[in-house]
Amino acid sequence: GGRVVPVNPKGGTIFGYDSVTSIGAIATPVDLAVIVIRPDAILDAVRESADRGIRNLLILPGGFAEAGPIGIARSEALLKLAAERGLTIAGPNCAGLIHLDPEWRFAATFLRDLPPGSKAATSNGLAFISQSGALAEEFIDKAKGFRHSAVPQPRKQ
């Protein structure tokens, strides 16, 4: 498994994990930055992540193209930044990423009541990909009894 390193400008402990005060203060390599902050601070966090060498980002909050002229400008700036810095971004405004294989379980989402996972290589494992968080949540709720291996919900702007 990987290591979780929360970032909080005030420091402290978050859900039992010791935090660092900035993205640049993370001492170990980072495979994925999960960004869950207010929309007007996201571009700075993406820049700081890129400066730190983090190329994969998951941005859960909205406040972009769906939020009127300010959000559209923010979305265009994010797309430009991603292209200039070679970033892979899922989001913004998405329900997250869920991988339920018991050998490599990962969930960066606000969705609850995740189903039990199944081994991704088994014939009874089901992978579901959705661009709609609402559809993914409905699928998770209604597909109880199915063994899932992955439920990612990227949203492309």
Regions found by a protein language model. Give the residues of each.
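Catalytic-core regions of core metabolic enzymes
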Residues: G1-Q157
